[in-house]
A protein has these predicted regions:
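Ribosome-associated translation termination/rescue signal centered on the conserved GGQ peptidyl-tRNA hydrolysis loop
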Residues: 87-352
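Charged, heptad-repeat coiled-coil alpha-helices that serve as long linker/dimerization "arms"
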Residues: 1-107, 345-352
Length: 352
């Protein structure tokens, strides 16, 4: 590991030298890329410097322990430095784990009502609200792409982009089947029903990241509609794109113009095609092996929201919280942190 860390320090110093040259900003795109790389390496370099300082503090304390008057003080210094060194070693192991290249990207989130009829649509709306409130807490913005509402205020399907640095790194664990247990608003008998909704989270890819042949795309236009099929505008501004080779269909009706809706559709299509390619590569390399914690299979039940008990349980890490109201209001960092920690532990195990 020390050799890896020294290589990181050497690379960081090289990038620092380049950034100080007079012509560094001659190519702004290249400069921005190098600065991002430098910023990514900086936490590793700082932690390694602190690790080496702790190591030196231990050596200095050991040398002075032979002096009876200094022994007690040096023993305290040595113990503190040793504990810091061990803590920094663990931190460096995590910092050296391969980074997901998409972690800093925006995300496209797709929510679909699943088993449970109108109640599943109402739950899908609750999930949409939960993620929207979480995004607001992070200072991120939500950009609607497609929102198909039911007459009772539920959501058949909701597609939206969350714009914010690191959005994918936090929300990638949300893909899967979410299960709700509660007394439906439509139920007069007071019986608890079980319903589901599915969530898919994709890193937002630009068209430049994915090669799309325009001849492979069929574009359809239609009128945007609201709940119950009510037209919300009188022009055919909504856009549906069909990628003929893969059969992928994407739609957007939230913008006022065809051009804007088509642009959003292309962003979604690029992300979906990228995901297919990544899944293909993953299956070739791992033989379809999936870790216990990760982005989650879409047909995997990942979490249960039990309203009568006020309980939320994430089945992947066995975490149960008895504060369902705050979770539904977007307070999901504790769940995400537990999933990220478990993901790191899994990667560390596979890295050794």
């Amino acid at each position: 590991m020390l050799n890896k860390l020294q290589a990181v320090v050497n690379k960081y110093e090289e990038l620092c030298f380049k950034s100080e040259q007079p012509d560094f900003y001659a190519d702004p795109k290249k400069a921005a890329k190098l600065l991002r790389e430098k910023n990514d390496l900086e936490p590793i370099v700082e932690a390694f410097q602190a690790y080496r300082q702790a190591e030196q503090d231990m050596l200095d304390a050991e040398e002075l322990m032979s002096d009876p008057e200094m022994k007690e003080l040096c023993q305290e210094t040595y113990t503190a430095a040793k504990a810091q060194k061990e803590e920094l070693f663990e931190k460096l192991q995590i910092l050296l784990l391969p980074k997901d290249p998409n972690d800093e990207k925006n995300v496209i989130v797709e929510i679909r009502g699943g088993v449970g009829g109108e109640e599943s649509a109402l739950f899908a709306h609750s999930l949409f609200r939960m993620y929207s409130m979480y995004a607001a807490k992070q200072g991120w913005t939500v950009e609607l792409m497609n929102y198909n509402e039911t007459e009772l205020g539920g959501v058949k399907e909701a597609d939206f982009i969350i714009n914010g640095r690191g959005a994918y790194s936090r929300l990638k664990y949300e893909s899967g089947v979410h299960r709700v247990q509660r007394v439906p608003e439509t139920e007069s008998g007071g019986r608890v029903h079980t319903s589901t909704a599915t969530v898919a989270v994709l890193p937002e890819m630009e068209e430049v990241d994915v090669q799309i042949n325009p001849a492979d795309i069929e574009m359809q236009v239609y009128r945007a509609s609201g709940a119950g099929g009510q037209h919300v505008n009188k022009t055919s501004s909504a856009v549906r794109l069909i990628h003929k080779p893969s059969g992928i269909v994407v739609a957007c009706q939230e913008e006022r113009s065809q051009l804007q809706n088509r642009e959003k559709c292309m962003r979604m299509l690029a992300s979906k095609l990228y995901e297919i390619e990544q899944e293909k590569l993953s299956s070739e390399v791992t033989g379809m092996r999936r870790s216990q914690v990760g982005t989650g299979m879409r047909n995997e039940r990942i979490r249960t929201y039990n309203f009568p008990q006020g309980r939320v349980t994430d089945h992947r890490v066995g975490l149960t919280l008895y504060r369902i109201d705050s979770v539904m209001d977007g307070d999901i960092d504790e769940i995400i942190n537990a999933l990220a920690t478990a993901d790191q532990a899994e990667k560390l195990k596979n890295n050794t």
